[in-house]
């Protein structure tokens, strides 16, 4: 795999990687996401609740919102694609492992394939999020649309 900073559709190759920003997860960052999303589920806020009857999930304490992973992936794709006039059109993710306060996570994209049509150019990207131990905590697939040279969007 080759790390890419290019957003030139023609020079992108299958296997090129896109690195995203690292994110240090804290109780405060989890609380701020609760406030932003209006999701005050005790999964994200209440250690006692997580250790009680619900504790059979074995999380052992509060966990970060899965949508926070989604947002980090979206930020990575937007930071990479937007300068070229490209737009994230689709993102599907699956949460694999809970993320807890004290974890540091980082999204990564891997170019899977490219396709050109008369009206647009498409890049399919495998995405994943890893924690500080190299464990995958989320995985998925994204589609980014690049404008055709000479089009109004280009």
State the predicted function of each range.
Residues 1-17, 100-154:
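HotDog/MaoC-like acyl-thioester-processing domains
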Residues 2-87, 149-154:
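Hot-dog-fold acyl-thioester-processing enzymes
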Residues 21, 29, 87-91, 105, ...:
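A generic structural signal for short beta-strands and their flanking turns/coil linkers
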Residues 22, 95, 109-111:
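Conserved hydrophobic positions within beta-strands
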Residues 50-55, 93, 138-144:
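Short C-terminal domain-edge/linker segments immediately following a structured domain
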Residues 79-101:
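Mid-chain, well-packed structural core segment of small domains
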